[in-house]
Curated annotation (Swiss-Prot):
Coiled-coil portions: 68-152
Topological region Extracellular: 49-161
Chief localization: Golgi
Protein name as it appears in the record: Bone marrow stromal antigen 2
Organism: Homo sapiens
Gene3D superfamilies in UniProt: 1.20.5.1700
Keyword Chaperone: no
Similarity remark: Belongs to the tetherin family.
Phenotypic consequence of K18R: Abolishes redistribution to late endosomes in cells expressing KSH virus E3 ubiquitin-protein ligase K5
Reported impact of Y8A: Partial resistance to Vpu and significantly reduced activation of NF-kB
Post-translational modifications: Monoubiquitinated by KSHV E3 ubiquitin-protein ligase K5, leading to its targeting to late endosomes and degradation. The GPI anchor is essential for its antiviral activity.
């Protein structure tokens, strides 16, 4: 048999004890950290799965749904408001255009009224003149009628006014037709 020689690192005894104590300390520290972190994790897990937590989660989800619905309704309301504002602007523009048109129509109507008033004044003057002329001709006609009647009773051969009577009658009829 061959001889075997084992070479061991010779470690002093005191170093081995220090190592064991160090490993034991690290192990205890790790175990302590696991326990310190594990206990709150277990408590958190229990609380997270509790009925109150689930109710809170449901409430949060409902709030999100309601918030989303309200945001949609707000968006629709804002769009509707913008549409109404656009319609109001159109209506205001139309009203302004109609008011301008109405003012123009009023001015034109006032001008027409003034023209008609002037024409009425002119026609009234013509009517007064024609009435005065008719009155004058009526008096002349009466005078001529009296003369004609006198000539029937007192005939005269040199009377030229009897030929003017039919002409005067035609003038009177023409004037009365104009007045009507």
């Amino acid at each position: 048999m061959a001889s075997t020689s084992y070479d061991y690192c010779r470690v002093p005894m005191e170093d081995g004890d220090k190592r064991c104590k160090l490993l034991l300390g690290i192990g205890i520290l790790v175990l302590l950290i696991i326990v310190i972190l594990g206990v709150p994790l277990i408590i958190f897990t229990i609380k997270a799965n509790s009925e109150a937590c689930r109710d809170g989660l449901r409430a949060v989800m409902e709030c999100r749904n309601v918030t989303h619905l309200l945001q949609q309704e707000l968006t629709e309301a804002q769009k509707g408001f913008q549409d109404v504002e656009a319609q109001a602007a159109t209506c205001n523009h139309t009203v302004m255009a109609l008011m301008a048109s109405l003012d123009a129509e009023k001015a034109q109507g006032q001008k027409k009224v003034e023209e008609l008033e002037g024409e009425i004044t002119t026609l009234n003057h013509k009517l007064q003149d024609a009435s005065a002329e008719v009155e004058r001709l009526r008096r002349e006609n009466q005078v001529l009628s009296v003369r004609i009647a006198d000539k029937k009773y007192y005939p005269s051969s040199q009377d030229s006014s009897s030929a003017a009577a039919p002409q005067l009658l035609i003038v009177l009829l023409g004037l009365s037709a104009l007045l009507q």
